[in-house]
Amino acid sequence: MRNACTRARLTRTARAMVKTLFIAIASVTFFFTSDLALPQSAAAYPFWAQQTYPETPREPTGRIVCANCHLAAKPTEVEVPQSVLPDTVFKAVVKIPYDTSVQQVGADGSKVGLNVGAVLMLPEGFKIAPEDRIPEELKEEIGDVYFQPYGEDKDNIVIVGPLPGEQYQEIVFPVLSPNPANDKNIHFGKYSVHVGGNRGRGQVYPTGEKSNNNLYSAAATGTISKIAKQEGEDGSVKYLVDIKTESGEVVSDTIPAGPELIVSEGQAVKAGDALTNNPNVGGFGQLDAEIVLQDANRVGWLIAFVALVMLAQVMLVLKKKQVEKVQAAEMNF
């Protein structure tokens, strides 16, 4: 009898252990495969800046890190109100102008349209307004833009893109101002706003490698002995440019599809000479602006002061006219 009970207990224990083990395996499997089936937002564009510079996209020098990969300088504009009241929704407009008739080199070497993107660094406490706080008119201006915070605790740093440049040369950000009455760390005063705008692909990857949207130059001095075209199994195309030096050594430069070769076999080149054109038509630009978080009470007192000054001026004018009338009456008398 005891043996039967013992065997029953062991059987139940074994079943429980197997069930627990099965659940653990299923949980681990789901954990590792969920990132593949449902990619996290951090892996979406622009993950380069977020992964390489997780704390802030702005260097101590003031330079926004996007400029490390997008080497060409292009203009960027921003429009923000001069001052805003607490707990109000306003719009910040980032303008990224460029010639829409030009096309850039795609990753496969083909010609494609330019994409645009922007980063808006707001003061602490400012953030993208919730959906229910955005007026309908402003929603129409925003369109289908998705605003991505730079990090979990960085709601004041917002990233947008890539977006089709032909439709979004102006990106409208709906911003909610903080209320110092609810947050003691927020104070009234003047704050800085930092903006970066980009159009087109970068010339350098964060790893330091060149993209195919860049100029390629000779690695050695000599004569170009051979230019060969190679096609990969995936259909990718690249060119091998062999340079024979005076010592007889052959140095090979690999050029991906995209840049156009401007050299030919038998041509003498020096180290650093361009082998291709520069296909880049895009670029990055940044600028700073200022915004004042205004106290409504101060505005009220300012209006009252202005009204008092105007009233005093009116009284002075009336008094002056009264004196003139008295003087005129005395002269007539």
UniProtKB/Swiss-Prot annotation:
GO biological process, one term: photosynthesis
Residues forming coiled coils: none
Locations listed in the record: Cellular thylakoid membrane
InterPro entries to which the protein is assigned, alphabetical: Cyt-f_TM (IPR024058), Cyt_f (IPR002325), Cyt_f_lg_dom (IPR024094), Cyt_f_lg_dom_sf (IPR036826), Rudment_hybrid_motif (IPR011054)
Membrane topology per record: Single-pass membrane protein
Alphabetically ordered keywords of this record: Electron transport, Heme, Iron, Membrane, Metal-binding, Photosynthesis, Signal, Thylakoid, Transmembrane, Transmembrane helix, Transport
Main location: membrane
Cofactor(s) annotated in UniProt: heme
Domain of life: Bacteria
Residues involved in heme binding: Y45, C66, C69, H70
Cofactor annotation comment: Binds 1 heme group covalently.
Transmembrane segments: 299-318
A GO MF label: iron ion binding
The keyword Nucleotide-binding belongs to this UniProt entry's keyword annotation: no
A cellular-component GO term for this protein: plasma membrane-derived thylakoid membrane
Residues in the signal sequence: 1-44
SUPFAM superfamilies, per database record: Cytochrome f subunit of the cytochrome b6f complex, transmembrane anchor, Cytochrome f, large domain, Rudiment single hybrid motif
Cysteine disulfide partners in this protein: none
Quaternary assembly: The 4 large subunits of the cytochrome b6-f complex are cytochrome b6, subunit IV (17 kDa polypeptide, PetD), cytochrome f and the Rieske protein, while the 4 small subunits are PetG, PetL, PetM and PetN. The complex functions as a dimer.
Role according to the record: Component of the cytochrome b6-f complex, which mediates electron transfer between photosystem II (PSII) and photosystem I (PSI), cyclic electron flow around PSI, and state transitions.
Similarity comment text for this entry: Belongs to the cytochrome f family.
Protein name: Cytochrome f
Record lineage: Bacteria, Bacillati, Cyanobacteriota, Cyanophyceae, Nostocales
Gene assigned in the entry: petA
